[in-house]
Amino acid sequence: MRGARGAWDLLCVLLVLLRGQTATSQPSASPGEPSPPSIHPAQSELIVEAGDTLSLTCIDPDFVRWTFKTYFNEMVENKKNEWIQEKAEATRTGTYTCSNSNGLTSSIYVFVRDPAKLFLVGLPLFGKEDSDALVRCPLTDPQVSNYSLIECDGKSLPTDLTFVPNPKAGITIKNVKRAYHRLCVRCAAQRDGTWLHSDKFTLKVRAAIKAIPVVSVPETSHLLKKGDTFTVVCTIKDVSTSVNSMWLKMNPQPQHIAQVKHNSWHRGDFNYERQETLTISSARVDDSGVFMCYANNTFGSANVTTTLKVVEKGFINISPVKNTTVFVTDGENVDLVVEYEAYPKPEHQQWIYMNRTSANKGKDYVKSDNKSNIRYVNQLRLTRLKGTEGGTYTFLVSNSDASASVTFNVYVNTKPEILTYDRLINGMLQCVAEGFPEPTIDWYFCTGAEQRCTTPVSPVDVQVQNVSVSPFGKLVVQSSIDSSVFRHNGTVECKASNDVGKSSAFFNFAFKGNNKEQIQAHTLFTPLLIGFVVAAGAMGIIVMVLTYKYLQKPMYEVQWKVVEEINGNNYVYIDPTQLPYDHKWEFPRNRLSFGKTLGAGAFGKVVEATAYGLIKSDAAMTVAVKMLKPSAHLTEREALMSELKVLSYLGNHMNIVNLLGACTVGGPTLVITEYCCYGDLLNFLRRKRDSFIFSKQEEQAEAALYKNLLHSTEPSCDSSNEYMDMKPGVSYVVPTKTDKRRSARIDSYIERDVTPAIMEDDELALDLDDLLSFSYQVAKGMAFLASKNCIHRDLAARNILLTHGRITKICDFGLARDIRNDSNYVVKGNARLPVKWMAPESIFSCVYTFESDVWSYGIFLWELFSLGSSPYPGMPVDSKFYKMIKEGFRMVSPEHAPAEMYDVMKTCWDADPLKRPTFKQVVQLIEKQISDSTKHIYSNLANCNPNPENPVVVDHSVRVNSVGSSASSTQPLLVHEDA
């Protein structure tokens, strides 16, 4: 049997040799040149059923060798002429190559068709950004259709993903993008009408390096004492680990420093971070110098330097004070400011008054700031100084190595005050006065009982004596005059004066015989009485004129109105004076330290202040304080109290300026609210016009921490509910380019105990996503007000404030706005009204409703997307303007508004109030325009809002006919005349 088999094989070999000259699948050689071996069967591809015998023969006069390359690139060798595989398996699918001694080869590709195994799957799926990646899923059966790539969960592949199938190798993904990272795919094909799928492949993308590393150090200068430990951490950020870094000392040539500790980690898929920690355990003076942190990748290099200065011992250097001699008028405030450099940091700081007592009295306060690593500022504010409080004020500061001091000489200028003037002693008239600077006493005489004398007394008749001399307090001066110089009945005036002011006293006397006696002036029909009557009459006329003008001028009132009920076409407002006030809001006014004025109007002002112990007993926080001017009348005081009650009634919301406290007893009413560090939105938009970026393209997420923020189910804020300290925030990254910058801002609202931010909000550019976010936030805030039955009546960009994280807050700025000089407010009757922001029913019928607020919101959107332009540009408010509003004139789309947002504006400007959307519906419309990450961030921030309340939401989808008369006290605009 074996002999028969051998003969058969020999016959096959001969047949192959005879046919080899014509077989197109085998390589051929020119006469005289070595020829490649021949393979039987003589074809480029062979299909073998699984379980059958695979038999291949290599024919060549010389030695031959078979090699088989598996689907996962392993090589199997066979040095026989024949390759026989009994019961072939699908894993034997691949390329079989025969080579001879001349190095010439011939190949055949074999498919081992297995009904149970269509795909050969092996090796993980890796790809480099901007290159091709091969999904190794070759087929065991080439006779299938629709060989392609699908997403694991049945979703659509990325729209820009393209691939090329090859049954022998797999499927090649062309031009891999970073966005494909962790994309799960399967190979798929159709056999006999049935879809078959391979195992899962997860694509891991290696980022292409397209930028230099980001290198940073927390401080660019360091000051140490000899023997202290110097530690500086350099942070290097790149897309992958293929970045080199080191510390160098510039001496002046760079010298590599080997004693460096390395730490590294991945903060997300394409965010690799490394820290190089340089430590000098015991610094010497000659260690001073410039240290450079250097990093490079295939794209380029980056570096940052920090300077070290080592001193022998600590020091305190007080900066020269321009003027240590201070003059202040009685009752005024004065700030004593000392700037100094100290290292180590000061351990003791104190103000001393007159070398014996502390200068920090109850009504004064001391403020100390660390301006930089070693620079400090200390300020003593002396409030409402009295004449007796002049003197030396000394600032003492010390640390472990040094001490220093500086002394201020404070002089309080006081108006003269006459102490004694009404006695005639031994024929002498005496006048004693005190004041600073030293008063000058002059004497005047007039006949009769007058209250003003003009005839001076000759100086030779006057004796002047300094009673007391004090270096800082009031100076007392006495002057005497001999009464014998007066020959007639009359009045003597003693007048004391200095640079601050003057005061007078009068001495009336009459002759009786040869003696002079002090007498009382006649009290009936005296010139003085007549003068008083005339003055009183003139004063009465003036008062009447002023009263008339006062009644005609606009009065301060709370813009926000709370609706009590809706009766048919009429809104009935709650009288805010009847709202309750909870004294839990009371805050001690002596714990407020006032700073600069943020805004001022005809009735009052808003002042930046520091509140001590508002949230925690040992914490200071920046707040805004509303207050009236000293000239405020009862109506203004009641209006401010009403505003306080309305704010306390509304409760807390992230997108309104929230009430923090109040001072209503022991002085004028103060309303303490949140401080918004970036001012009003209108001016913010105008500042950002030149840096506006019109883009909505997304980038990949850059930090796992912030992915957790986006996908967490719990709020990512702390639970302390502290009011935000208005200092630079912290920076982090989230999936989109704009969200990345927004998160750097918003994080200061959420995470207050992490790395300081690289950028402040006000340094970042403005883009379309910011405008959409502002639109969304203001709509949310107005929806909250509507849920509390509150109508705003003056919604505009000027009444929206901006704080850290670019969080918008709706406010009523009427108290601190000078509407008399604001062209946005037009005088009608006794009111100044923002006509260009008002709905037609508000202009012509004085109707203020939820729907009129929606109209104003549409105008606000126009302001927003025009980056702070004035609405109806170039159009004055006159009869022509009123006519155009009545006839349905509406503004065209602003330059930067997407079509969808202009559609929202037009729905807000519907002439029929009932057809305008509610704020709840506006929120839903804008939610479709903003990114999911922005919505999620906003949701997290809303959950973090301190002391949240859960108001009962009133559904305003049940609309009423709003065109009715208003209970507002504001007068309606007069119907205009046609142009």
From Swiss-Prot:
Cytoplasmic side: 549-979
Domain Ig-like C2-type, chain residue ranges per copy: 31-117, 126-210, 217-315, 324-417, 420-514
Residues bearing the modification Phosphoserine: S720, S743, S748, S823, S893, S962
PTM comment: Ubiquitinated by SOCS6. KIT is rapidly ubiquitinated after autophosphorylation induced by KITLG/SCF binding, leading to internalization and degradation. Autophosphorylated on tyrosine residues. KITLG/SCF binding promotes autophosphorylation of isoform 1 and isoform 2. Isoform 1 shows low levels of tyrosine phosphorylation in the absence of added KITLG/SCF, while isoform 2 requires stimulation by KITLG/SCF for phosphorylation (in vitro). Phosphorylation of Tyr-573 is required for interaction with PTPN6/SHP-1. Phosphorylation of Tyr-571 is required for interaction with PTPN11/SHP-2. Phosphorylated tyrosine residues are important for interaction with specific binding partners.
Segments crossing the lipid bilayer: 528-548
Tissues where this protein is expressed: Isoform 1 and isoform 2 are detected in bone marrow cells, spermatogonia and spermatocytes, but not in round spermatids, elongating spermatids and spermatozoa. Isoform 3 is detected in round spermatids, elongating spermatids and spermatozoa, but not in spermatogonia and spermatocytes (at protein level). Isoform 1 is widely expressed and detected in fetal liver and bone marrow. Isoform 3 is detected in bone marrow cells enriched in hematopoietic stem cells.
Catalytic activity: L-tyrosyl-[protein] + ATP = O-phospho-L-tyrosyl-[protein] + ADP + H(+)
Result for mutant: F860S: Mice display white fur, hearing loss, anemia and mast cell deficiency, plus sterility in both males and females
GO MF terms held by the record: ATP binding; cytokine binding; metal ion binding; protease binding; protein homodimerization activity; SH2 domain binding; stem cell factor receptor activity; transmembrane receptor protein tyrosine kinase activity
Active site: D794
UniProt effect for mutating Y573F: Abolishes interaction with PTPN6/SHP-1
InterPro entries in alphabetical order: Ig-like_dom, Ig-like_dom_sf, Ig-like_fold, Ig_sub, Ig_sub2, Immunoglobulin_dom, Kinase-like_dom_sf, Prot_kinase_dom
Reported impact of A207E: Loss-of-function mutation abolishing ligand binding
Keyword Ligase set for record: no
Glycosylation sites: N146, N296, N303, N323, N355, N370, N466, N489
Binding site for Mg(2+): Y571, N799, D812
Start and end residues of each Protein kinase domain: 592-939
Additional remarks: Numerous proteins are phosphorylated in response to KIT signaling, but it is not evident to determine which are directly phosphorylated by KIT under in vivo conditions.
Family assignment from sequence similarity: Belongs to the protein kinase superfamily. Tyr protein kinase family. CSF-1/PDGF receptor subfamily.
Complexes and interactors: Monomer in the absence of bound KITLG/SCF. Homodimer in the presence of bound KITLG/SCF, forming a heterotetramer with two KITLG/SCF molecules. Interacts (via phosphorylated tyrosine residues) with the adapter proteins GRB2 and GRB7 (via SH2 domain), and SH2B2/APS. Interacts (via C-terminus) with MPDZ (via the tenth PDZ domain). Interacts (via phosphorylated tyrosine residues) with the protein phosphatases PTPN6/SHP-1 (via SH2 domain), PTPN11/SHP-2 (via SH2 domain) and PTPRU. Interacts with DOK1 and TEC. Interacts with the protein kinase FES/FPS. Interacts with PLCG1.
Disease affiliated with this protein: Defects in Kit are the cause of the white-spotting phenotype (W). White-spotting variants induces severe effects on pigmentation, gametogenesis and hematopoiesis. Mice homozygous for W42 die perinatally of macrocytic anemia.
PANTHER family with a match to the protein in the record: MAST_STEM CELL GROWTH FACTOR RECEPTOR KIT, TYROSINE-PROTEIN KINASE RECEPTOR
Descriptive protein name: Mast/stem cell growth factor receptor Kit
